[in-house]
């Protein structure tokens, strides 16, 4: 949602949470051969998904951090960084600059945090099934306080976006609208199969990437932004597959509430195959585009980075619900590395 709120929907992106012992006990006999993998996956989920606790045991700062869900900020911050690098005007000294600090503040705790809060607010019924430890369904943050926090964070996001560039402030406003379209009834795009994943992926990648480039480009036109638009759009294809992997953790709740994700619509294994194809095609097409730009070495590196992901996808397809956390924890590193390689290629092409 919000510009980088896109992150919002993205809420689920890199790391996923919780599968209960109930679901593990329901595994059929033909899945017992994967018992050790299931146990490992469960342990990982327990580590990253705190149990439901009463508010008296948590400080207000801890509650706020859980509500903002910091783990979801990373992909959006990374997209902003890739956009900055691709501008050709971003160098090592800029890491210490005020503009970069504001960019990280915006794409991380502010815009992405706003998205997370919006998503939690509108998904509170679903979270009672899938993620009961989240602050709202857990009773740790009231709806009134959540509304106040969302309003304050939205205003701060627009303000910081404007300080970076007026156009970025507009992106933030559009992102806030997108967040509502994604999560709120009656539209609730996340219920509409492909629509939810696509809008999240676009917001997740294209908008922050272009915002990063705009932030550091002294002058820009649609033509100058075109290489970044193409690469970011192609990685959006891959990100759509990533969104599908994040859906495996909430299949039961989605099915009960009527959220039509790919795993719900096509089955978990078929959805895993679709996700793998999208992830690979997007990156290979990006490598092909770099070849068109004459950046052959960068294209080769991007293509090689797909190989370990392809290998890990065999385990994912075999057991999507137990291997999703492991896949994201390992394979995503190669995908985001490919994004940075593409950004460096665009910078090289411009220079």
Language-model segments: residues:
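Multi-pass alpha-helical membrane architecture of UbiA-family
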Residues: 3-27, 31-351
